[in-house]
Amino acid sequence: MKKNLKILVITGGVISGIGKGVTSASIARLFRYDFRVTPIKCDGYLNTDPGTINPVEHGEVFVLDDGGEVDMDFGHYERFLNLNAKSSWNITMGKIYKKILENERKGKYLGRTVQLIPHVTDEIKSTIFQIASSENSEMLIIEIGGTVGDMENILFIETVRQIRHEIGSGNIAFIHLTYVPSPAGINEQKSKPTQQSVKTLNKAGIFPDLIIARSSQVLTDQIRKKVAMFCNVESNSIIDNIDVSTIYEIPISFYKQGVHEILSSKLNIKVDPKIEELSKLVGVIKSNFFVPKKIINIAICGKYAELDDSYASIRESLVHVGANLDLLIKSTLIDSNDLNESYLKEFDGIIVPGGFGGKGYEGKIIAIKYARENNIPFLGICLGLQLAVIEFARNVCGILDADTEENLLKDKPLKSPVIHLLPEQKGIKDKGATMRLGGYPVILKKNTIVFNLYGQDRIIERFRHRYEVNNDYIDLFEKNGLVVSGFSSDFKIAKLIEIPKNKFFVACQFHPELITRIENPAKLFLGLIKACI
C-alpha cells in the first residue's frame, strides 16, 4: 500500500438509485488532475459480476477493455475521469465469497473456523489494498452500492471502518449521499429520512465528514441547520445535489460549493480541479437544453425499454455529440416488443441497440426496414448489426427464411443461418463471462463511411457477443449493395456493415457507446447525428 494513500468512501442512504455513481465520479473528477485516482465499486450481490443480470433489473452491463463485465457506474467513472477501468476494481460479494471458499479448500486458513469477521472483511481489505498497490494509486474513491442498512452491505461498511482505524482518520473521508424528499401537497423538505440514515451509519461506527443531499431544490436554511445539528456535521459540509439538465453540471456544482476544499482540508492535501474545459461543454449543453439551436430526435428501439438505465451509455453518447455539435438531441426509448412503423415517423434517426434472446427481434427488424427503405439515418449496435443483416437478406436478397442461430429450435432446423455462432463458442455451456468480451482491433476498409469517420484503418473497440455474420453469405450481400466495411484483425469476422447508397446506414458488432467521452464523442454516433442534420 502506498504510504500517503488517501481514501474517499461514498455511501448512500434512504433509497437506492439516486446517483451514487455520478456523485462518486463527480467528486473523483475534482481530484483527477492532482492525484492518480482509482475508483472502486463494492456491490453486495452474490453474482460474480453483473454479466448475467437482466438490464431491466440492474441497468446496463458495462464492458471494459480487459473483458470485464461490471456495474454501469464504471461508465460514469470512465467518462468523468477519462480512464480505462479494470474489472478487478468492481468488488462483488460473489467474488469475495468465491475466493474465501477456494482458500478454505486449499487449507490457507490453517484449520481455523472461517467467519464473516475477520475472514470476509480481511479479504475485502486485501483486495482494496492490492488494487491500490497494483495501480500505484494516490487516491481511492470507494463507492459502496445500495443503501446503509442493507444486509448485503454490512461487511463492506465494517471493512471501511477497519480501514480508517488502520490508516488513520487523517487519510480517509466519509461522504454520505442521502435523499431529502418534498412530499406532494406538503411543499416542505423533510430531513427525518436523512437523520435516520446517518444514525444507521453511526451505529456501524462511521461518522460522515460530508453529507450530500439529493433533492429537487436547494436545501432551505432551516433544513440545513437541522441536518447539521442532528447528523453532527458543519453546515458548510452539507452539499446540495439538485436535479440538473445534465449530469456533467454536478462536478461544477460541487466545485462551486467547495467540496474539494472541504475534503482537502480533512485529508491535508492541496488540489486544483481545473474545471474550465468541462464548464465550456456544459454551457453548450445547458444553452441547448433551455433554448435549443436545433433539435434532433432519435429513436432507440430496444427490448429493455422498461428501464432508462438499460441504455445509459447510448444516451450519454448522444449527449456528448450534442455538446460538441452545439445542438439538442432528444432520445426516446421505443419498446421493440410492440413496435410498428407509425411510431417512427417523427424521428430524424434510428438506433437499434444490443440485446439477447428472441424477444423483440421482429420489432427491431421492422425499425431497420423502415430506416433502410426511407433513407433514415440508422445505427445498429451488436444485435442491431445481426438483425440488419437478417433484414437485408430477407427483403433485398430474397432469402425469406434468413435468421440467426440464436433462434434455433431443436425440432426445427434453420435453413438459412445468415448469423451463426462464433466457432470459439461451440461447446460452451456456461453463460457467465464466456462471450467474446473486451477490446479487440477492427480493420476498416478504405473509402467507406466508417473509414472516413475514424480517419484510420485500424481501431480498437469493445465487444460483447456470441454470434457473427455467416461468411458464406457475404458475397451475395455485397452483390446486392451491402458493404462489409470492417473486419477482425484476421479478416475472418465481419465487424461493420454499411449501405453506401443510403444517407447513413451503418451497423457494428461492437459497442461504440462504451468508449465515448464528452471531450471526444464516439465516431459512429457523431456520424449518425451529422447525417440527421
Swiss-Prot record:
Q: Name one GO molecular function term.
A: ATP binding
Q: Give a short account of what the protein does.
A: Catalyzes the ATP-dependent amination of UTP to CTP with either L-glutamine or ammonia as the source of nitrogen. Regulates intracellular CTP levels through interactions with the four ribonucleotide triphosphates.
The answer, when asked if Metal-binding is one of the entry's keywords, is yes
| The protein's name | CTP synthase
| Region Amidoligase domain: start-end pairs | 1-269
Q: Gene encoding this polypeptide?
A: pyrG
Native source organism of the sequence: Borrelia garinii subsp. bavariensis (strain ATCC BAA-2496 / DSM 23469 / PBi) (Borreliella bavariensis)
**InterPro entries to which the protein is assigned, alphabetical:** Class_I_gatase-like, CTP_synthase, CTP_synthase_N, GATASE, GATase1_CTP_Synthase, P-loop_NTPase
What pathway does the UniProt record associate with this protein?
Pyrimidine metabolism; CTP biosynthesis via de novo pathway; CTP from UDP: step 2/2
Task: Look up the domain of life of the source.
Answer: Bacteria
